């Protein structure tokens, strides 16, 4: 099963995360299939960048977001957009 999840990068005490599509059996920082965004929580205003087209494609193909990634998608409005495409 493919999951959309966070992959930690950055240095000690300064985490940066990639939002990746990866096999659920691979380790957190292991192999991934595709990078769909970035998340920098340590900045004053949390900075996130998304490739919306890739994310919607992965979701439509059955990828499951983890809890944290789902919250990021909800805050950015991507999850609502995905839900409206399902109803059509």
Swiss-Prot record:
Q: InterPro entries this protein is in?
A: Ribosomal_bS16, Ribosomal_bS16_dom_sf
Give the disulfide map: none
Entry annotated with the keyword ATP-binding: no
Which keywords fit this entry according to its UniProt record?
Ribonucleoprotein, Ribosomal protein
A GO molecular function annotation here is:
structural constituent of ribosome
Task: Tell me which Gene Ontology terms the entry assigns under biological process.
Answer: translation
The record's annotation in SUPFAM superfamilies points to: Ribosomal protein S16
Q: Name one Pfam family in it.
A: Ribosomal_S16
Q: Name one GO cellular component term.
A: small ribosomal subunit
Family (UniProt): Belongs to the bacterial ribosomal protein bS16 family.
Entry protein name: Small ribosomal subunit protein bS16
Q: List the top taxonomic levels of the source.
A: Bacteria, Pseudomonadati, Spirochaetota, Spirochaetia, Leptospirales
């Amino acid at each position: 099963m493919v999951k959309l999840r966070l992959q930690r990068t950055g240095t000690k005490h300064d985490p940066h995360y990639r939002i990746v599509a990866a096999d659920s059996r691979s380790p957190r920082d292991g192999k991934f299939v595709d990078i769909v965004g970035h998340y920098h929580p340590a900045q004053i205003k949390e900075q996130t960048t998304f490739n919306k087209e890739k994310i919607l494609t992965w979701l439509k193909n059955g990828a499951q977001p983890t809890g944290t990634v789902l919250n990021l998608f909800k805050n950015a409005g991507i999850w609502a957009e995905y839900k409206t495409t399902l109803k059509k």
